[in-house]
Regions:
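RNA pseudouridine synthases
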Residues: 1-129
């Protein structure tokens, strides 16, 4: 399966979908979820209810299990019910799901490939960095 839908000029690819989860390719420039209740910026969270059959419950929060930064594109897993959300959250908590990040760099590198094995943490002063 390789379908997609459009939301506010963003094309969101559906890489996989079953009764419990959907795996999407979130484009760069799209927030994962609202910053606050008054935020009307385009975000993945708002696009889900009109494109997926998601069990409606405050605990499910429109299926968002993890997030990607606004400027980061990549795979994001959506839970479609509370059971799958709890299982996925537990898997992330236990680090049973491995995340890999690929960065594109401009300029000349001395090597074709490098590996950076460091924790990625939020900038406490500027939350958008």
């Amino acid at each position: 399966m390789n379908n997609s839908y459009f939301y506010n000029n963003f094309q969101i690819e559906i890489l996989y979908e079953d009764n419990d989860i959907a795996i999407l390719n979130k484009p760069s420039g799209l927030l994962t979820h609202k910053k606050n209740e008054n935020d009307d910026s385009p975000n993945l969270q708002d696009s889900l209810n009109s494109n997926f059959d998601i069990e409606d419950d405050e605990k499910n929060k429109e299926g968002i299990v993890h997030r990607l930064d606004k400027d980061t594109s990549g795979i994001i897993i959506i839970s479609k019910n509370i059971i799958s959300k709890k299982l996925l959250q537990e898997m992330f908590k236990k680090r049973e799901l491995k995340k890999n990040y690929l960065a594109f760099s401009y300029g000349i590198l001395n090597q074709n490939q490098i590996e950076i094995n460091k924790n990625i943490v939020r900038n406490k002063i500027k939350r958008t960095q």
